[in-house]
Amino acid sequence: LFRSGQASTPLAYLIGKTHPDVSYIEVVSSIASKSAGPATRLNIDEYVETTANAASFFSGCTNTKAILILNPAIPCVNMQTTVFATVGQNNMKELKVLVDEIVAKIQVYVPKYQLIVPPTMEDNRIIMTVQVQGLGDYMPSYAGNLDIINCAAIVTAEEYAKKNLKSA
């Protein structure tokens, strides 16, 4: 079962699945500056490269770009990710259905993963935006960028343990 600690990867995958002629994907994420600790700040270049590579790998598009914005606003903003894609043919009907399905699946392990701008076509460009809030249990609710990683790791570890307990 596919589990992603990245908000954009499932969306890029679905764009590639429904639009095999995708020629460009851009991922723009904005996170609260306070949710980016020293380790995050030291690894921004790695995050940007990994995000662009994941968009490419899962969509099949070789021309990808990722941008990360550390927003210093007070009160802190929730994590938000917008995916832009340039496509040839329009297959928005199937994309919208699949995006709704994947959002529901992600919400099982990341309850506050929300589609706030559904897939929209403008000329030959697809735009969609998700917002991720944390549960606010251990970290502030604006730290959705940290919660999505933790939630994906927890559910993956739980599934791994269940599988290994059954085979033992």
Regions found by a protein language model. Name each.
Residues 120-168:
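NAD(P)-dependent Rossmann-like dehydrogenase/reductase catalytic/cofactor-binding core
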